[in-house]
């Protein structure tokens, strides 16, 4: 239960990050959508790994 507030704060920070997609997408921008999804997934994995390094108890329940 001690890890829950940490994950909630991290998820709120990720959700409140400014979006890069400020312009309308064109036909040429469609392949970039998967790139942005991959970047968000990689960022989320890095945050979880960082949290596991600091709060080892979080990783024991995975």
Curated annotation (Swiss-Prot):
Annotated Pfam families: Chi-conotoxin
Protein name in UniProt: Conotoxin Sr5.7
Keywords for this protein: Cleavage on pair of basic residues, Disulfide bond, Secreted, Signal, Toxin
PTM annotation: Contains 2 disulfide bonds that can be either 'C1-C3, C2-C4' or 'C1-C4, C2-C3', since these disulfide connectivities have been observed for conotoxins with cysteine framework V (for examples, see AC P0DQQ7 and AC P81755).
Upper taxonomic lineage: Eukaryota, Metazoa, Spiralia, Lophotrochozoa, Mollusca
Recorded GO MF terms: toxin activity
Tissue: Expressed by the venom duct.
Signal peptide (residue range): 1-22
Localization of this protein: Secreted
Source species of the chain: Conus spurius
InterPro entries assigned: T-conotoxin
Domain note: The cysteine framework is V (CC-CC).
GO cellular component: extracellular region
Propeptide: 23-44
Keyword Disulfide bond tagged: yes
UniProt entry tagged with the keyword NAD: no
């Amino acid at each position: 239960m001690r890890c829950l507030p940490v994950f909630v704060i991290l998820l709120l920070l990720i959700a409140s990050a400014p979006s890069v997609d400020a312009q309308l997408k064109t036909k040429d921008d469609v392949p970039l959508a998967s790139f942005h999804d991959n970047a968000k997934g990689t960022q989320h994995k890095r945050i979880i790994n960082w949290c596991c390094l600091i709060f080892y108890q979080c990783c024991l329940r995975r």
